[in-house]
UniProtKB/Swiss-Prot annotation:
Binding-site positions, Zn(2+) 1: C71, C73, C86, C89
Keywords, sorted A to Z: DNA-directed RNA polymerase, Magnesium, Metal-binding, Nucleotidyltransferase, Transcription, Transferase, Zinc
Gene (name only): rpoC
Spans traversing the lipid bilayer: none
Protein name, UniProt field: DNA-directed RNA polymerase subunit beta'
Highest taxon of the lineage: Bacteria
Reaction catalyzed: RNA(n) + a ribonucleoside 5'-triphosphate = RNA(n+1) + diphosphate
Function: DNA-dependent RNA polymerase catalyzes the transcription of DNA into RNA using the four ribonucleoside triphosphates as substrates.
Length: 1374
């Protein structure tokens, strides 16, 4: 194993062509065959002559010459003696590079266990020998003896004996009656004696007979290990080493420092310890030293080898003089500084430089400004060759001198060299692929790189001192790739959502907004013009301004492509933008004939790209930028104190709210509401107040004061910046001129007293103190967030890196159904947005005319979308990566459109990495918690009613209503939904109506927009009767199940259900209310059950014992917790929780079958919920903690997948109960909800790619006739292959169920051990792989980068394909 790892980290010469890498345990003979000689002395180099000592760790005879073609004693020098071995010093004359490749070895005087196989959990040695690791350690480290052969004694084989016990046994049975031994030798002997085929048979038989689950698991593990050894042809005794490899000296160098001291690699020190102890042990054995001394030396040798392989894994780590632990071989591979991540996945490259960036507004989109000095340094070799070619310099040396002197000819040559030679610019952190783009360099004076303003969004760059790196693609292929794939002009659309990313921002937006403003009473209003020159003339002579409303005759292309004149109302400013538009019938002037905000500009750029192509878009964007900058400058927009307007109505609103709050305080003192309810109401009232003040302020800012002075600023500058999308948000303006509003404490709880002042008025000391807490929390969150966001991205990339488009069509008929996302009655994401760029899974017909709209497998383009929308389809079957059936990778048809180009994705595209980047890149914008804007709380008022958002017809699903004494309709169903339908019967909105709500409309009613449909109390959950009768309290014992809680503040008592203590001989009390009829019998409800209402802990009673109540009355209320104690995991942690498939805190419980609910007998602190299915088969029981809020009542009918307990459901449960599609929909919905809150748009398909990677494995439930074991987890495709083989041989196929894995686990269990090792837990992965003799087929990106080949994506994919085809042809020809 050792050599494979070394070889694989060494440089590979071009002659070695390979397709896969295999890892094995190295046998002693193999180690000796690699070696060029035995290292017997611990010396390194001679401190006087600085030559390596003979037979030492740097010996030239073993490892090769120190200088090229020169032996150590200097007898043979130069090339002519190549290959000769010097007879005097024994050194072969060759290149010194061999000191990086040649290995040595140490013959150990006693065998030593390899610590990876001993201590890497689960310990392989202990599993094989079926002993505990502790016992194995006792034997290895010479604490206990082990019985190898019990002979005539009654001792057991494998039994451990201490020194005294051994002595007693010898006295009892005689010296030779049994054999017991100690140390690594005995372990080696025991491993040698294992007969794997026999052991396999025994384990298999035992597995069939045993019934204990724990034992089964243990047997399966052992069986798996035995099978691994059998298949890989590794011998178990190789886990104990007789010979130790010594890695090449150049890999563990010894360097001389200035002061004559030496710096050495820790490995040399660790090797020296091993050699010293080994030599001492040899001497002790030769001199027949006492057993106890020899044994101690053997133990020390074992410890020295342990430290060399993995320092600190067992016992105390070996430390140097400065008390710093030595860096062992394992540490060389592990972690961020290890070989994998530091040198193989991330390399430093030459031909690169970095400098500060400045803005380059006069550049074209494909250009960047490169400082002359920098270019001269970067392009040196190119300049030398050109100087020589033109005969300006005679030799390279002369050319070098000329460049150093910076002669004038050099600059001319440099100009020529860089012409059309793209350079790559990169800004760290590179969070997505647009963080590296190619530009054509322009030589500039100065020392800073100039960057085009429009690419700043993609780089996330600003000019406050950011630095960027420049890289030069050298080969012609690299230049070609840079130009075709990476040029900034080829990256107009964002790969995350397919929208333009080259959009004007900040100043440009402000300039364009100013330019397209139109004012009413301007000079020359209503004038008519026929061409632009005429208008320019009028503008120059001040007959009009750029904002004057005028009429203009403009020639436009119609649908047939002919020019037709139209008269339009516009302004000169808007016409200037209009002039830049490419002529196309689909791009009408109306798109820009308005006040252009950032959103509008983005839409126009998108339209231009879709209809006129890339070149037109680039030219348009560039011209737009120049225009925007020009007018941002000439508008002279600035703002002062007076632009922050404080609305006059502010004091009124505040006074009203304070009165409202006094009322709540009064209600609380009178005991009408609880503290939690009061808190909620106060927070709500202040939220509403803040919003009202903000709205009034917005109105005042938006309508500027009337003033006849022509030089007077007619529109508020701050308002202009916010409304145009240039800078700032209304949230910020609210705090400048309105009121700051409610603040949060650091634990996320909202402080009841808001900050009434704004920044213009200034905060009082107390307000300042109040807001500091939330602000600091925000600052700290930001600092912590960056790291966890980066880590999430890394895990996502790792899990998805081998997801590549490998074929055009996998031919599957499967797909997923999508519909628009409707929340709270509003369409949040329309269907069009979800299906654009996907492919249809079935033929799609018009529901009325039955015309074919889409063929199966056809891409849904913008044109097709219009047809789908006009047909009024509300759900569609599309293909998805989740249902793709390609064995390696994914097919184009299932993936759909490549968002960055707007066409069908091409083969070889690394969609996994793109998906990971798209989800990870906005990660830093996501909050750690959902509530903050500089500490200000953004909490909407609680929803307590539903209004109609359209004129529509009402449809009520699962309507179960009772009419109460006030003639109101009360909802009694737990899953009542109210739908609003349009004239065609298509769903426009959907609202969930909670239990206990008052319905104000009924099924089939027609409603108008804004009409109230239902209302309820948002702070409590009621328990309502559906029959009238007399109340009877059961099991309500004062102080045991019920308590009078007197509110401290008010002194008003109320009866509250409490946790019941064990009572009277263990009879469990279950507090409930029964309804009695006229004769005192218990009333029967409509579902056939008796009218018994069980009360949960914390319920507050609303009725007295013995009173008469009527239908729809509230018996008790369960208060909802105050807003934040039920902490919503928001932002980044929620995304991580979903993709890691963790169990959420306070998770929900879902019903696994359809059936009726019954509460069984409680058990200790748990409630028992039983679901009886309708067909009277097996009922299912759930045990839930008593404090949890159960959302069902006894007798309720629940459907499979309904929640029994509130909270976030566990993903594994959804998969088990509802299947893959529902699970995928849920994850997509939840992840999107987090990003949507931050205004980030990500295409669903990226999340689907990650989900596909999480669903790679299946768990075997029945092994059938295959070699698989029940409970074994195996790759889906491997499982299918094994089954196909079994069926071919006429055996029963195995059965398995899909399992969901978190991304970390999925990354570690990928098929490629190289990729897994470079991710996390390197030693464990490599240990496992070596034992199983795993083969890495090098299919993913990471493993290819690590072995230094082209990645099998993009152009590399086709190179790979061509190479394989060529090899196949050659084989056929042979």
């Amino acid at each position: 194993m050792f050599m494979s790892v070394v070889n694989f980290c060494g440089q590979l010469s071009n002659t070695q062509q390979f397709d896969q890498i295999r890892i094995n345990i190295a046998s002693p003979d193999q180690v000796r065959s690699w070696s060029f000689g035995e290292v017997t002395k611990p010396e390194t180099i001679n401190y006087r002559t600085f030559k390596p000592e003979k037979d030492g760790l740097f010996c030239a005879r073993i490892f090769g010459p120190v200088k090229d073609y020169e032996c150590l004693c200097g007898k043979y020098k130069r090339m002519k003696n190549r290959g000769i071995t010097c007879e005097k010093c024994g050194v072969e004359v060759t290149v010194s590079r061999v000191r990086r490749e040649r290995m040595g070895h140490i013959e150990l005087a006693a065998p030593v266990a390899h610590i990876w196989f001993l201590k890497s959990l689960p310990s392989r040695i202990s599993t094989l020998l079926d002993m505990t690791m502790r016992d194995i350690e006792k034997i290895l480290y010479f604490e206990n003896y082990v019985v190898v052969d019990p002979g005539l004694s009654i001792l057991q084989k494998g039994e451990l004996l201490t020194e005294e016990e051994l002595q007693k046994a010898k006295d009892k049975y005689g010296e030779d009656a049994f054999t017991a031994s100690i140390g690594a030798e005995v372990i080696q002997q025991m491993l040698k004696e294992l007969d794997f085929s026999k052991l396999k048979q025994e384990l298999y038989e035992e597995l069939q007979t045993t019934s204990s689950e724990v034992k089964k698991k243990k047997l399966v593990k052992r069986l798996k290990l035995v099978e691994d050894f059998l298949e890989s042809e590794n011998k178990p005794e190789w886990m104990i080493m007789d010979v130790l490899p010594v890695i090449p000296p150049e890999i563990r160098p010894l360097v001389m420092l200035d002061g004559g001291r030496f710096a050495t690699s820790d490995l040399n020190e660790l090797y020296r310890r091993v050699i010293n102890r080994n030599n001492r042990l040899k001497k002790l054995i030769e001199s027949k030293a006492p057993d106890i001394i020899v044994r101690n030396e053997k133990r020390m040798l074992q410890e020295a080898v342990d430290a060399l392989f993995d320092n600190g894994r067992r016992g105390r780590a070996a430390k140097n003089a400065n008390k710093r632990p030595f860096k062992s071989l394992s540490d060389m591979l592990k972690g961020k500084q290890g070989r994998f991540r530091q040198n193989l996945l991330g390399k430093r490259v030459d031909y690169s430089g970095r400098s500060v960036i400045v803005v380059g507004p006069e550049l074209k989109l494909h250009q960047c400004g490169l400082p002359k000095k920098m270019a001269l340094e970067l392009f040196k070799p190119f300049i030398y060759s050109k100087l020589e070619l033109y005969g300006i310099a005679t030799t390279i040396k002369a050319a070098k001198k000329m460049v150093e002197a910076e002669k004038s000819e050099v600059w001319d040559v440099l100009e020529e060299v860089i012409r059309e030679h793209p350079v790559l610019l990169n800004r760290a952190p590179t969070l997505h692929r647009l963080g590296i783009q190619a530009f054509e360099p322009l030589l500039i004076e100065g020392k800073a790189i100039q960057l085009h303003p429009l690419v700043c969004t993609a780089f996330n760059a600003d000019f406050d001192g950011d630095q960027m790196a420049v890289h030069i693609p050298l080969s012609i292929e690299a230049q070609l790739e840079a130009r075709v794939f990476m040029m900034s002009t080829n990256n107009i659309l964002s790969p995350a959502n397919g929208r333009p990313i080259i959009v004007p921002d900040k100043d440009i937006v402000l300039g364009l907004y100013y330019l397209t403003l139109a004012f009413d009473n301007e000079v020359g209003a209503g004038m008519m013009f026929s061409d632009l020159a005429e208008m320019e003339h009028a503008l120059y002579n001040k007959f009009i301004t750029i904002h004057t409303k005028i009429k203009y005759r403009r020639n436009q292309l119609n649908a047939e492509g002919k020019m037709v004149p139209v008269i339009i109302d516009t302004t000169y400013g808007r016409l200037m933008v209009g002039e830049l538009l490419p002529s196309n019938p689909n791009i009408e002037f109306k798109f820009i004939n308005k006040q252009l905000t950032k959103k509008d500009i983005s839409l126009v750029i998108d339209l231009v790209y879709r209809h006129c192509g890339q070149k037109a878009t680039v030219i348009f964007a560039d011209q737009l930028m120049k225009l925007g900058f020009k007018y941002a400058c000439s508008s002279g927009i600035s703002f002062g104190m007076d632009d922050m307007v404080v609305p006059e109505s502010k004091s009124t609103h505040i006074n009203e709210t304070q009165l409202e709050i006094q009322e709540f305080e009064q209600q609380y003192s009178n005991g009408l509401i609880t503290y939690g309810e009061k808190y909620n109401k106060v927070v709500d009232a202040w939220s509403r107040c803040t919003d009202r003040v903000a709205n009034d302020m917005m109105k005042e800012i938006a309508t500027p004061p009337v003033n006849d002075d022509p030089n007077h600023q007619r529109i508020n500058a701050i308002y202009m910046m916010a409304i145009s999308g240039a800078r700032g948000s209304f949230q910020q303006i609210k705090q400048l001129g309105g009121m700051r509003g409610l603040m949060t404490k650091s634990n996320g709880q909202i402080i009841q007293t808001p900050i009434i002042s704004n920044f213009k008025e200034g905060l009082t000391e107390f307000e300042c103190f109040n807001s500091a807490n939330g602000m600091r929390k925000g600052q700290i969150d930001t600092a912590l967030k960056t790291a966890s966001s980066g880590y999430l991205t890394r895990k996502l990339v790792d899990v998805a890196q081998d997801c590549i488009i490998t074929e055009k069509d996998c031919g599957t008929d499967k797909g997923i159904e999508v519909k628009s996302v409707i929340e709270g009655g509003e369409v949040i994401v329309p269907l069009a947005e979800k299906i654009l760029g996907r492919t249809a899974a079935i033929d799609i017909f018009h529901p009325v005319t039955n015309d074919l709209i889409l063929n199966k497998g056809e891409l849904i383009s913008e044109a097709k979308l219009e047809q789908i929308e006009s047909a009024g389809l509300d759900r569609i079957m599309i293909k998805s990566v989740l249902t793709c059936e390609s064995t390696t990778g994914i097919c184009s048809i299932c993936y759909g459109r490549d968002l960055a180009t707007g066409t069908l994705v091409s083969e070889g595209e690394a969609i996994g990495v793109i998906a990971a980047q798209s989800i990870g890149e906005p990660g830093t914008q996501l909050t750690m918690r959902t509530f903050h804007i500089g500490g200000a709380a953004t909490k909407g008022a609680e929803v307590s009613s539903v209004d109609a958002s359209y004129d529509a017809k009402v449809k009520i699903i699962s309507r179960n209503v009772v009419i109460n004494s006030e003639e109101r309709k009360i909802v009694m169903s737990r899953n009542c939904e109210l739908l609003l339908l349009d004239n065609n019967g298509n769903e426009k909105a959907r609202h969930k109506i909670p239990y206990g709500a008052r319905l104000l409309v009924d099924d089939g009613d027609m409603v108008i927009k804004t009409q109230k449909l239902a209302e309820w109390d948002p702070y409590t959950i009621p328990i309502i009767t559906e029959k009238s009768g007399k109340v009877l309290f059961k099991d309500m014992v004062e102080g045991i199940t019920i308590r009078d809680v007197t509110d401290e503040a008010t002194g008003i008592p109320s009866k509250v259900i409490i946790e019941s203590k064990q009572y009277s001989r263990g009879a469990e009390l279950r507090p409930r209310i029964q309804l009695l009829g006229a004769k005192g019998e218990v009333i029967t409800l409509s579902n056939g059950l008796e009218a018994r209402y069980y009360l949960p802990v914390g319920a507050v009673l609303s009725v007295e014992d013995g009173v008469q109540i009527s239908v729809g009355d509230i018996i008790a209320r369960i208060p909802k917790e105050s807003t934040t104690t039920k902490d919503i995991t928001g932002g980044l942690p929620r995304v991580a929780e979903l993709v890691e498939a963790r169990r959420p805190k306070d998770h929900a419980v879902i019903a696994e079958i359809d059936g009726r609910v019954e509460f069984g007998k409680d058990y200790k602190s748990k409630r028992r919920i039983i679901i009886h299915p309708i067909d009277e088969t097996m009922s299912i029981e759930y045990m839930v903690p008593k404090g949890k809020h159960v959302v069902v009542n006894e007798g309720d009918f629940v459907k499979k997948g309904d929640l029994l307990i509130d909270g976030n459901p566990v993903l594994q449960d959804i998969l088990k109960v509802m299947g893959v599609e529902v699970l995928a929909n849920y994850i997509v919905k939840e992840v999107q909800a987090v990003y949507r809150l931050q205004g980030v748009k990500i295409d669903d398909k990226h999340i689907e790619v990650i989900i596909r990677q999480m669903l790679q494995k299946v768990e075997v439930t029945d092994s059938g006739g295959t070699t698989l074991l029940a409970g074994e987890k195996i790759d889906r495709h491997e499982f299918d292959e094994i089954n196909a083989k079994a069926m071919k041989n006429g055996l029963k196929p195995a059965e398995a169920q899909l399992i969901l894995q978190g991304i970390t686990k999925a990354s570690l269990q990928t098929r490629s051990f190289i990729s897994a090792a470079s991710f996390q837990e390197t030693t464990r992965v490599l240990t496992e792989a070596a034992i199983a003799g795993k083969v890495d087929k090098l299919r993913g990106l990471k493993e290819n980068v690590i072995v230094g080949r082209l990645v099998p994506a993009g152009t590399g994919y086709f190179m790979d394909k061509m190479r394989k085809a060529a090899i196949k042809l050659d084989e056929e020809n042979v």
